[in-house]
Amino acid sequence: MAKQIKFDSDARSALQEGVDQMAKAVKVTLGPKGRNVVLEKSFGAPTITKDGVTVAKEIELEERLPNIGAQVLKEAASKTNDDAGDGTTTATVLAQSVINAGMKSVTSGANPMDVKRGITAAAEEVVTHLRNQSDPVEGKDRISQVATISANNDDAIGDLIADAFERVGQDGVITVEEARGIETYLDVVEGMQFDRGYLSPYFVTDSEEMEAVLEDAYILIYDDEVGNMQDLLPILEKVSQTSNPLLIIAEDVEGEALATLVVNKMRGTLKVSAVKAPGFGDRRQSMLEDIAVLTGGTVISEEKGYRLENATLDYLGQADRVTIDQDNTTIVGGEGSEEEIEARVNQIRQQIANSTSDYDQEKLQERLAKLAGGVAVLNVGAATEPEMKAQKALVEDALSATRAAVDEGVLPGGGVAYLRALESIEEVEVENEDQEIGVSIVREALEAPLRQIAENTGHEGSIVVQKVKDGEGDFGFNARTEEYGDLLDQGVLDPTKVTRSALENAASVGGMLLTTEAVIADLEDEDDDDGGGGGGGGMPAGGAGGMGGMGGMGGMGGMM
């Protein structure tokens, strides 16, 4: 297909046009009094949102060259969202300011490479300043403040997220799901839970709840199938002498072995239950090792020289309580050593850091949570489907921002952290006048977020910026109350990770567009039904989630 090519200022002007259109739609959502954006859907009701990344994802421009500029700006927003979970609108505002000021200077004859070097040097100095000024997040109240701000000042959501962090800890898994009703509430699963249920309903000890509950249980962990009862018999005899119940976790328990276990359970000879091992392939082996570390047991594996018929009580793990239903097994109070659990947790953290796969990182994070904390589910309710979608996106953003705050601390919000970082730019060393222009571009951009927040509130941005600059420390403009004061004391906070990532990505995208000398795109086609908007592409589709466990079969009881 024939292409169109634009060079120099023509290329940059076309890109800038797309940047401005994208930024104009996104930046109106910034701040507690940001405006709504209505998104048309191909089917169903339109979506009404104040979420910057949701707006950005929807934008595809009709003209191909401006659309490329819009998609490049979208990358700055999306990268910030990926890195820190929030800050997409701030990144958009910063990037637009850098790009527009940079385009003016390059058009006036400045060397774009030197301008870019100045931008990069200034941004790095500001990031260092932000890290040094960061205030660690400790305590439920501070976490609630951060979550509330990220949730567009919804106190109820902020309190729920703070409760979730308090219950499962920093390493716990917190997920967001759609509730079946209109209430938003928190569910917490303590201990280690995996998606495998009992292999026979005859293992149930609580017929009302249809659960098998084992107190002070031994746990046998075997990485192969159990079919021959003779292999299992020696360890069963040893456990029966202790009067403690036994949970068997194996690749499968079938035939004679399962039938014998059921008979012994029904006769009261042995308190026992059996479940399939969680996971598949290599991940199954890793999860069995996790269970062994948590409970102080050993994975019985012939590959490692352990045989089931030679197993002793020393091989078995122990837990205060095991609860098994048709679909899940939950182990609470595992008696593994704290040192070994901590070492295993650190090992998984390292694997997360080294992994390049989003899916692998997600599964590793789940394993980490099962060992180190627990699993909390925020169930989001709403009266209508559009409201549900918007509310869920809001909670997900707030959760991500809160995680970022716990990771790297917080700074005064409302754009104040950027203004206080202006002094650090004076220390940037430059080699020529064009690099100084790059530094000045960042200096100007640092004022843009507060200016936009003030304008969205209905105030004159320049006046608000000057008044805050005249103050010191955490003094700033609280857009929610439309008053000036100490923002940290008022709970107006931004996660350092979000503030930092927004500037880093804005500077990166800005420098890239300023040094663009040519743009190549398909020719405009009047007969093209899609309007030519697909050039830049939106976000790639997320990877499909795991298949989940198949649950217990539950039908083996007929062998009685």
Swiss-Prot record:
<dbReference type="GO" id="GO:0005737">
    <property type="term" value="C:cytoplasm"/>
</dbReference>
<dbReference type="GO" id="GO:0042026">
    <property type="term" value="P:protein refolding"/>
</dbReference>
<keyword id="KW-0143">Chaperone</keyword>
<feature type="binding site">
    <location>
        <position position="494"/>
    </location>
    <ligand>
        <name>ATP</name>
    </ligand>
</feature>
<keyword id="KW-0413">Isomerase</keyword>
<dbReference type="InterPro" id="IPR002423">
    <property type="entry name" value="Cpn60/GroEL/TCP-1"/>
</dbReference>
<dbReference type="Pfam" id="PF00118">
    <property type="entry name" value="Cpn60_TCP1"/>
</dbReference>
<dbReference type="GO" id="GO:0005524">
    <property type="term" value="F:ATP binding"/>
</dbReference>
<dbReference type="InterPro" id="IPR027409">
    <property type="entry name" value="GroEL-like_apical_dom_sf"/>
</dbReference>
<comment type="similarity">
    <text>Belongs to the chaperonin (HSP60) family.</text>
</comment>
<protein>
    <recommendedName>
        <fullName>Chaperonin GroEL 2</fullName>
        <ecNumber>5.6.1.7</ecNumber>
    </recommendedName>
</protein>
<comment type="function">
    <text>Together with its co-chaperonin GroES, plays an essential role in assisting protein folding. The GroEL-GroES system forms a nano-cage that allows encapsulation of the non-native substrate proteins and provides a physical environment optimized to promote and accelerate protein folding.</text>
</comment>
<feature type="binding site">
    <location>
        <begin position="29"/>
        <end position="32"/>
    </location>
    <ligand>
        <name>ATP</name>
    </ligand>
</feature>
<feature type="binding site">
    <location>
        <position position="414"/>
    </location>
    <ligand>
        <name>ATP</name>
    </ligand>
</feature>
<feature type="binding site">
    <location>
        <position position="50"/>
    </location>
    <ligand>
        <name>ATP</name>
    </ligand>
</feature>
<comment type="subunit">
    <text>Forms a cylinder of 14 subunits composed of two heptameric rings stacked back-to-back. Interacts with the co-chaperonin GroES.</text>
</comment>
<feature type="compositionally biased region" description="Gly residues">
    <location>
        <begin position="532"/>
        <end position="546"/>
    </location>
</feature>
<dbReference type="InterPro" id="IPR018370">
    <property type="entry name" value="Chaperonin_Cpn60_CS"/>
</dbReference>
<keyword id="KW-0067">ATP-binding</keyword>
<keyword id="KW-0547">Nucleotide-binding</keyword>
<dbReference type="GO" id="GO:0140662">
    <property type="term" value="F:ATP-dependent protein folding chaperone"/>
</dbReference>
<feature type="binding site">
    <location>
        <begin position="86"/>
        <end position="90"/>
    </location>
    <ligand>
        <name>ATP</name>
    </ligand>
</feature>
<dbReference type="InterPro" id="IPR001844">
    <property type="entry name" value="Cpn60/GroEL"/>
</dbReference>
<dbReference type="GO" id="GO:0016853">
    <property type="term" value="F:isomerase activity"/>
</dbReference>
<keyword id="KW-0963">Cytoplasm</keyword>
<dbReference type="GO" id="GO:0051082">
    <property type="term" value="F:unfolded protein binding"/>
</dbReference>
<dbReference type="InterPro" id="IPR027410">
    <property type="entry name" value="TCP-1-like_intermed_sf"/>
</dbReference>
<feature type="region of interest" description="Disordered">
    <location>
        <begin position="524"/>
        <end position="546"/>
    </location>
</feature>
<dbReference type="InterPro" id="IPR027413">
    <property type="entry name" value="GROEL-like_equatorial_sf"/>
</dbReference>
